[in-house]
């Protein structure tokens, strides 16, 4: 029986040793005082304590709770790893932001280099057509108002019509035509109508007077043959003289004055020009 009791006692001692071993492997739960002191040492610059420092720290912190040397060693290792992860995360975020900013900056710079600024773009077609139309109208108005525009066909026709109204001879079949056109500028030289071969021609006053003085086409007989035109001087209207001082020298002058006063012209008859011609012919026949 003695050996059996010894075995039981030895078995009981082994069980107690196993229980102590299990209890010693429990996880370390630091107290707030221990954590505060460890963080103060870490902020002070201690990162990897040696064996002597670990024993001193363990002896100092054991007064606030259960702690071992390995607990102090692992705490410093884990704290450094957490700081490295935080730093790496911050570096990754900052690098990502910098890369995005660089990408957008490069993209915008390339777009600005490819696309020209708005002021360098050519004008649109509607604006160009409107500007060309406006310019054409302005040029046309300037050509009508300029003194040298009398040489163009349109301006020449307008000047001729104005001259026909103000300073020209009137024909019987065109006396009561359309309303008179506007007057031309005073700088334009006065024009004359004369009948040449049955058609009206507009000439300057000096040239018309020169032709009339040097050619026999403007004789009274020629004018009578060409529709019986009554001449009208192209000078400003003079104040009317008293009837007592006016001398009627020919029937042609009387007819011309009456036609000018009435506003129209009528064909001249042979009897008006030569009232005694018919009587002489009758006398010769008798």
From Swiss-Prot:
Residues 23-87 bind DNA. It is found in: Nucleus. Coiled coil: none annotated. One of its GO terms (biological process) is plant organ development. Residues 1-25 are annotated as: Disordered. The keyword NADP does not apply. The keyword Transcription applies. GO terms for molecular function: DNA binding; DNA-binding transcription factor activity. Transcription factor which may be involved in developmental processes. This is Putative WUSCHEL-related homeobox 2. It comes from Oryza sativa subsp. japonica.
């Amino acid at each position: 029986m003695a050996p059996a009791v010894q075995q039981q006692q030895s078995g009981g001692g082994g069980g107690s040793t196993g229980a102590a071993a299990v209890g010693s492997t429990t996880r370390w739960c630091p107290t707030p005082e221990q954590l505060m002191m460890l963080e103060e040492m870490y902020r002070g610059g201690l990162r990897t304590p040696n064996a002597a420092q670990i024993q001193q720290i363990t002896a100092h912190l054991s007064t606030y709770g259960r702690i071992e040397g390995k607990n102090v060693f692992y705490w410093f290792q884990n704290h450094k790893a957490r700081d490295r992860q935080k730093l790496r995360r911050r570096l990754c975020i900052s690098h990502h932001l910098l890369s995005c900013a660089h990408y957008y900056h490069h993209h915008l710079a390339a777009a600005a280099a490819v696309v020209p600024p708005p002021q360098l773009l050519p004008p649109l077609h509607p604006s160009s057509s409107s500007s060309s139309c406006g310019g054409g109208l302005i040029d046309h108005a300037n050509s009508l108002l300029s003194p040298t525009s009398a040489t163009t066909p349109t301006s020449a026709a307008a000047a001729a019509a104005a001259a026909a109204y103000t300073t020209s001879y009137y024909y019987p079949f065109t006396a009561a035509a359309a309303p008179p056109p506007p007057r031309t500028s005073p700088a334009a030289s006065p024009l004359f109508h004369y009948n040449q071969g049955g058609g009206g021609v507009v000439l300057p006053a000096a040239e018309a007077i020169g032709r009339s003085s040097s050619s026999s086409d403007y004789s009274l007989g020629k004018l009578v043959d060409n529709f019986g035109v009554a001449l009208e001087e192209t000078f400003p209207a003079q104040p009317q003289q008293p009837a007592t001082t006016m001398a009627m020298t020919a029937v042609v002058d009387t007819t011309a004055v009456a036609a000018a006063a009435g506003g129209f012209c009528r064909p001249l008859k042979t009897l008006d020009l030569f009232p005694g011609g018919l009587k002489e012919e009758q006398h010769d026949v008798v």
